[in-house]
Design a protein with these regions (language model features):
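Bacterial N-terminal signal peptides that target proteins for export
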Residues: 2-11
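Bacterial N-terminal signal peptides
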Residues: 10-20
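Serine-esterase "nucleophile elbow" of acetyl-processing enzymes
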Residues: 23-83, 87-88, 98-106, 110, ...
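Structural recognition of the beta-strand scaffold that forms the well-ordered cores
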Residues: 33-37, 65-70, 108-114, 150-155, ...
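Serine-dependent acyl-ester chemistry module
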Residues: 61, 74-77, 96-97, 112-133, ...
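Substrate-gating cap/lid alpha-helix
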Residues: 161-194, 218
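Conserved catalytic region of serine esterases and O-acyltransferases that act on ester linkages
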Residues: 208-302
Length: 302
């Protein structure tokens, strides 16, 4: 009975992940400079690495130039709840650094996953919702003005709490934010509906994706990556986080993501309580090229 139940759960997840939300393919990513923007979930980088890993593994003849540039606590709305970070500092807003990021990195493609911090964990409110919508619009406008060719909005992940009658569940706010994003129609911009995919997958299992309700664990990050890849028509083979992370290719891809993230974040500069002024990039890309050579050696064995 337990096996049958697990099979039904896997079927629900498979059905969720095999329906692309727009007509795209990996050729729109190959050979492009790709930036992932977001909050602590993106800065943690799990789903960014899983995405980069599968692209590298499944398409060894194509190159994908990926930069994970998320910042913990960040919003698009510019809002912050009282006592954030123990009252030490308000939430950072992307627009403090976005101009520098676009100028320095010059991305062709931008993925952006925001929303979970933007409602500041309170009831749905017209002003807060408007601030989020304005932030999304501003992000799209600034990216397009900087020459970004493709913008991919990723609807927010779920707030991983069980709904109880008469008790406020913050996920209801994120559901509204995601629904609004899904209605957007802008040239050069597409939306990947992570929220619905994650909600369906979570409802089909008993274990949480996020122990603290906000930050997904490895299984949640893998689901995020699969949702993104499926939107590009990628057929992702089954694998657990443990088996994937044991792959030497994954380890080098993760090393490259971490290396670039830390050095490029400092090169761009940011404010999160303290201000990190922009620093020289130095030999960051020379070292990145060495890691890429190891990745290519694994992808193209002699």
């Amino acid at each position: 009975m337990k096996i049958m139940k697990q099979c039904r759960h896997m079927l629900v997840i498979w059905l969720t992940l095999t329906l692309p939300s727009f007509a795209q393919n990996v050729d729109s990513l190959a050979g492009k400079k790709i930036v992932f923007l977001g909050d602590s979930i993106t800065q943690g980088g799990g789903y960014v690495t899983f995405t980069a890993y599968y692209l590298a593994k499944l398409y060894p003849q194509k190159n994908f130039d990926i930069y994970g540039l998320g910042l913990s606590s960040e919003t698009l709305s510019g809002l912050s709840e009282e006592g954030h970070a123990g009252g030490k500092f308000p939430r950072p807003c992307l627009f403090e650094r976005l101009g520098r990021l676009l100028e320095k990195v010059k991305p062709d493609v931008v993925f952006a996953c925001y929303g979970i911090n933007d409602g500041i964990y309170k009831l749905l409110d017209a002003e807060r919702f408007a601030a989020f919508r304005n932030g999304v619009t501003k992000l799209i406008e600034q990216c397009k003005a900087a020459g970004v060719k493709e913008i991919l909005l990723i609807t927010p992940p779920i707030f991983d709490a069980s709904s109880k009658a008469g008790v406020f569940n913050y996920d209801s706010v994120l559901t509204e934010y995601a629904a609004w994003e899904m209605m957007l129609k802008v040239s050069g911009m597409h939306v990947i509906d992570l929220h619905t995919a994650m909600r369906k997958a979570r409802d089909a299992r008993t274990e949480v994706f996020s122990k603290d309700r906000v930050h997904p664990g490895e299984e949640g990050h893998l689901l995020m990556a699969k949702t993104i890849l499926t939107a590009f028509g990628v057929s992702v083979p089954f694998g657990t986080p443990a088996t994937i992370k044991a792959d030497p290719l994954y380890q080098q891809v993760d090393l490259l993501r971490r290396h670039r993230s830390s050095h490029w974040m400092n090169h761009i500069g940011y404010t999160r309580g303290n201000t990190v002024a922009p620093q020289p990039l130095g030999d960051t890309e020379m070292e990145a090229a060495k890691i890429q050579e190891k990745i290519d050696a694994i992808r193209h064995p002699k």
